């Protein structure tokens, strides 16, 4: 396949050569009369007389044609004769100008067409470069930034990789901090009370074990020690009564403490700090320093109903709708 500019150049060159040959054939006689193609001996007087005679003949012909009405119809032969007659009377400078235009116009056409094609190719290359840069911009986020962008964040906004409650205002934030401080004070009081109850229950269990050991002792003692045993029994009975009173008080105190813990848990649930007690309260585990209350912080999720998810956000990391 040949290139289109080459075909156009060959066509324009052939056309210009054909025009040149035709012009040369039609104006050969006129050039000989004007002296462009000079013979070996030129008679200038004869040439001038011929021109004068020709002009006289032409003037007479025009006068005759003007007097006679044009009764004949227009035909292609008359048109061709008129064009040939007018072309034979043209100046040689007009012929030279026509030849130059026939050579230069095709060349200018090919040059301008080539510049247009290069501009279109440059525009296509610029568009491709812009698309590649946009694709690179879409892929420069890491995992943490993509996770933040999944929850309705725009790229124009600053990316915050740490948690920040966007729905709470500054005044509300101060109020919630005060409530958290008061709730922590209440939880510390309830923990101290539970520790005291646990210590009292441990003392009661220790005394019960001592009484059981006293009851299981052998009965092969002397009769003289019966009085002492009776006195011991009396003292032990008084101790048992005091222990039963302590137990009643201890049972009353956990009820009040359970109410306190309920109130504190309700306050904590309102401020999204729930205390999860599974089953009954294990006092021994509470007395140990390693066992602490498991406080689970549940941040408020921002509900953005107008958020839109694109393909990058959808395929970056799995998330919940």
Swiss-Prot record:
Residues 211-275, 299-321 are annotated as: Disordered. The modification Phosphoserine is found at residues 156, 199, 285, 298. The chain crosses the membrane at residues 94-114. It is a single-pass membrane protein. Residues 233-321 are annotated as: VAC8-binding. It comes from the Eukaryota. Residues 73-125 are annotated as: TSC13-binding. Keywords: Autophagy, Membrane, Nucleus, Phosphoprotein, Signal, Transmembrane, Transmembrane helix. It is found in: Nucleus outer membrane. GO terms for cellular component: membrane; nuclear envelope; nuclear outer membrane; nuclear periphery; nucleus-vacuole junction. The extended 80 Angstroms-longloop of NVJ1 specifically binds the highly conserved innergroove formed by the armadillo repeats of VAC8. Present with 1900 molecules/cell in log phase SD medium. This is Nucleus-vacuole junction protein 1. It comes from Saccharomyces cerevisiae (strain ATCC 204508 / S288c). The lineage of its organism: Eukaryota, Fungi, Dikarya, Ascomycota, Saccharomycotina. The gene is NVJ1.
């Amino acid at each position: 396949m040949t290139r289109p500019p080459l075909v156009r150049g060959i066509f324009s060159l052939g056309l210009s050569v054909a025009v040149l040959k035709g012009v040369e054939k039609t104006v050969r006689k006129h050039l000989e009369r004007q002296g462009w193609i000079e013979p070996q001996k030129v008679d200038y007087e004869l040439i001038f007389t011929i021109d004068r005679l020709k002009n006289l003949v032409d003037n007479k012909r025009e006068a005759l044609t003007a007097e006679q009405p044009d009764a004949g119809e227009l035909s292609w032969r008359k048109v061709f004769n008129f064009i040939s007659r007018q072309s034979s009377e043209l100046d040689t400078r007009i012929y030279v100008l026509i030849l130059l235009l026939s050579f230069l116009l095709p060349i200018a056409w090919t040059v301008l067409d080539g510049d247009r094609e290069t501009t279109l190719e440059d525009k296509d290359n610029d568009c491709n470069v812009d698309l590649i840069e946009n694709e690179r911009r879409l892929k420069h986020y890491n995992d943490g930034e993509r996770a933040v962008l999944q929850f309705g964040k725009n790229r124009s906004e600053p990316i915050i990789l740490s948690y920040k409650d966007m729905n709470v205002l500054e005044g509300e934030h101060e109020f919630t901090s005060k409530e958290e401080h008061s709730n922590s004070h209440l939880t510390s009081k309830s923990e101290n009370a539970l520790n005291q109850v646990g210590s009292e229950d441990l003392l009661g269990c220790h005394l019960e074990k001592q009484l059981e050991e006293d009851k299981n002792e052998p009965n092969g003692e002397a009769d003289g020690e019966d009085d002492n045993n009776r006195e011991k029994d009396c003292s032990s009975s008084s101790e048992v009564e005091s222990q039963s009173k302590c137990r009643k008080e201890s049972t009353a105190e956990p009820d009040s403490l359970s109410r306190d813990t309920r109130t504190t848990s309700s306050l904590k649930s309102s401020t999204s700090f729930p205390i999860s007690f599974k089953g009954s309260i294990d006092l021994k585990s509470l007395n140990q320093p390693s066992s602490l209350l498991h406080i689970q912080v549940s941040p408020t999720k921002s509900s953005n109903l107008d958020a839109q998810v694109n393909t990058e956000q959808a395929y970056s990391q799995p998330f919940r709708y």
